[in-house]
């Protein structure tokens, strides 16, 4: 039995924990260009509005920060051609320490717009930046309204309006 689904679930749970702890608006499995040939799905997308001095202004949404996370559990998953879609202002690959070391040691070309690689701590309690690739500023190419709408469409609410993260349930 492969450990891959279990590793993917544990990494996904850590991303959900991180997004919740950072008070982001977020959703898992966010689709862009749905029902089109170039349909792409991002594992997690988080949004934090810009609120200088804790004041919400009309520009808080457009100037806010979108963060995309792609979860990869093994080298086969990384090379599968699925995912590695980064549309955010910050974009992270989330993987095990072993996979991060393998990618770094084999001089794999990093995906365009990647900000860094996050890996779990030894006790799998949180994610830490293992490889920092933020040498230049990345700007999203999609408008905030489209990104927020994609997050809204991907939310999984129960009948009481409470968000249910489906990966944690499985």
What does each of the following model-derived ranges do?
Residues 30-32, 48, 72-75:
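Short, flexible loop/turn elements at secondary-structure junctions
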Residues 39-68, 85-86:
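Active-site beta-strand-loop-beta-strand hairpin of nuclease catalytic cores
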Residues 60-120:
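Catalytic cores of nucleic-acid endonucleases
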Residues 2-28, 32-39, 105-170:
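Non-catalytic C-terminal interaction segments of nucleic acid-processing enzymes
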């Amino acid at each position: 039995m492969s450990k891959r689904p279990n590793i993917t679930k544990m990494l996904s749970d850590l991303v959900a924990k991180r997004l919740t702890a950072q008070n982001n608006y977020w959703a898992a499995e966010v689709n862009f260009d749905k029902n089109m040939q170039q349909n792409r799905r991002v594992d997690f997308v988080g949004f934090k509005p810009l609120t200088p001095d804790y004041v919400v202004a009309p520009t808080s949404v457009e100037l806010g920060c979108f963060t995309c996370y792609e979860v990869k559990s093994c080298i086969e998953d990384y090379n599968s051609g699925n995912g590695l879609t980064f549309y955010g202002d910050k974009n992270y690959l989330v993987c095990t320490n072993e996979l991060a070391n393998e990618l770094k040691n084999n001089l794999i070309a990093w995906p365009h717009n990647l900000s860094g690689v996050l890996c779990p701590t030894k006790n799998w309690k949180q994610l830490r930046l293992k490889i920092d690739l933020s040498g230049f500023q990345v700007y999203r190419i999609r408008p905030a309204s489209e990104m927020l709408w994609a997050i809204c469409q991907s939310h999984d609410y129960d009948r009481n309006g409470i968000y249910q993260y489906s990966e944690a349930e499985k």
